[in-house]
Amino acid sequence: MTTGGKNTFYIHTFGCQMNQADSATITSLLQQAGYVAAESEDRAGIILLNTCAVRENAVDRIEHYLQHLQGLKKRDKRLIVGILGCIPQHQREEMFATSPAIDLLAGPDTYRTLPQLIEQARSGAKPFSLDFNVAETYEGIDPVRQGSISAFVPVMRGCNNMCAYCVVPFTRGRERSHPFRAVMGEVQKLVASGYSEITLLGQNVNSYDDPEQGVNFAALLDAVSCAAPQARVRFTTSHPKDISGELVRTIANRPNICNHIHLPVQSGSTATLGRMNRGHTIEEYLEKIALIRSLLPGVTLSTDIIAGFCGEQEEDHQASLELLSTLRFDSAYMFYYSTRPGTFAARTLVDDVPEVVKKRRLQEIIDLQNTISGELFQQAIGSVVEVLAESESKRSAEQLMGRTPGNRAVVFDREGYRPGDLVRVLITAATSATLTGRPV
């Protein structure tokens, strides 16, 4: 049984950094309405799941968790359970039927209505608010963040790219950029609060545009870098079509902009990219990588790869392996394709690659990328890197964990340092995912 009062709430956040940023906004909205954040779900009268619909396994995780919440509601009938984010936006008709535990639904553009939805749910209704609002950027809301070292700052919401496999345009709507002055106001608050790292967020972050101020993403990134000279500045996620010489030169010219770019490619086959509606060829992607590496010596690159997309032949898969071998990304998010209802692929393409083949191809991709990552990380042994300490290591309270400007995870001996410190670390060992060292 939960022990919190009826106006206490707890948010479980699933999925991407944008969801984490949204949860900070939701917390602020609810606190302004008189609700109190609980430290754990067993101390909350309201439990909210901020969900992700990008992949099938993410949806499965939510459905499994709802079984747990149904058990809690049987013991405490006053408990309110809300499903927020991308899943209800995408699957409204199915959501209430999924579990009797669900009391309310809210989509990414309607979090301002949560106080009213909660009160309606208490009266026995099953309310939902899932309208798209192309004007909603949650301007004027001060997010309530967890921690005081790294902060996510959404600069745009939604996506116009309509990749065939992707549900984001159907869950987060059309692109809309936050006003330049609002972004800079948020950054200035973070600087005044002493944050050490600021990450600019968007589903398609480098298509940012504030036409009233004449500010594109390169100009925004430059302005943020100048406004926060003592902080590291990052951004994610980029689309290859929006990588420009202006943007890369901005990164090169500003020492506090991290020397790391996450640039999803999804497949090494131009034919597969065409079916995916990615809007570029492999040759064009390679040109972008060449531009980046020519202007940013030592840059670390990461990517996304999907195995087994509709119509993928063995030669397409081999092209993906060849691409990984050629470009040698530092790391990659690797998945096999799962159909998302409502997408172009679900409506018009045939999911014709057998699951056993998808899994085999994915494993080959993972094995190759792990080998490449391991080789790259081994090359770092003996070097000294600057690490922003983020937290205690999961291994030991005598160690801290942090990241390099290139986004490599480093575990190092504590030696009196604290989270938030910038530490020069001599790398003494490496795996394919983590560097280990000692302060110097």
UniProtKB/Swiss-Prot annotation:
UniProt cofactor note: Binds 2 [4Fe-4S] clusters. One cluster is coordinated with 3 cysteines and an exchangeable S-adenosyl-L-methionine.
Q: Which residues form the MTTase N-terminal domain?
A: 7-123
| Annotated [4Fe-4S] cluster 1 binding sites | 16, 52, 86
Its required cofactor(s), as named, are: [4Fe-4S] cluster
Cellular localization per UniProt: Cytoplasm
Claim: DNA-binding is one of the keywords in the record: no
For this UniProt record, the keywords arranged alphabetically read as follows: 4Fe-4S, Cytoplasm, Iron, Iron-sulfur, Metal-binding, S-adenosyl-L-methionine, Transferase, tRNA processing
List its EC numbers: 2.8.4.3
Q: Which SMART domains does the entry link to? A: Elp3
Q: Which CDD domains match?
A: Radical_SAM
GO MF annotation terms: 4 iron, 4 sulfur cluster binding; metal ion binding; N6-isopentenyladenosine methylthiotransferase activity
Cited Gene3D superfamilies: Methylthiotransferase, N-terminal domain, tm_1862 like domain
Q: One matching Pfam family, short form?
A: UPF0004
> Any idea where the TRAM domain is?
378-440
Q: Which segments constitute the Radical SAM core domain?
A: 145-375
Reaction(s) catalysed (UniProt annotation): N(6)-dimethylallyladenosine(37) in tRNA + (sulfur carrier)-SH + AH2 + 2 S-adenosyl-L-methionine = 2-methylsulfanyl-N(6)-dimethylallyladenosine(37) in tRNA + (sulfur carrier)-H + 5'-deoxyadenosine + L-methionine + A + S-adenosyl-L-homocysteine + 2 H(+)
Q: Name one GO cellular component term.
A: cytosol
Task: Identify the residues that bind [4Fe-4S] cluster 2.
Answer: 159, 163, 166
Source superkingdom: Bacteria
The similarity annotation says: Belongs to the methylthiotransferase family. MiaB subfamily.
Quaternary state and interactors = Monomer.
> Which function does this protein serve?
Catalyzes the methylthiolation of N6-(dimethylallyl)adenosine (i(6)A), leading to the formation of 2-methylthio-N6-(dimethylallyl)adenosine (ms(2)i(6)A) at position 37 in tRNAs that read codons beginning with uridine.
Alphabetical list of PANTHER family matching this protein: CDK5 REGULATORY SUBUNIT-ASSOCIATED PROTEIN 1 (PTHR43020), MITOCHONDRIAL TRNA METHYLTHIOTRANSFERASE CDK5RAP1 (PTHR43020:SF2)
Annotated protein name in UniProt:
tRNA-2-methylthio-N(6)-dimethylallyladenosine synthase
Report the source organism: Pelodictyon phaeoclathratiforme (strain DSM 5477 / BU-1)
Q: What is the lineage of its organism?
A: Bacteria, Pseudomonadati, Chlorobiota, Chlorobiia, Chlorobiales
- What gene is this protein a product of? miaB
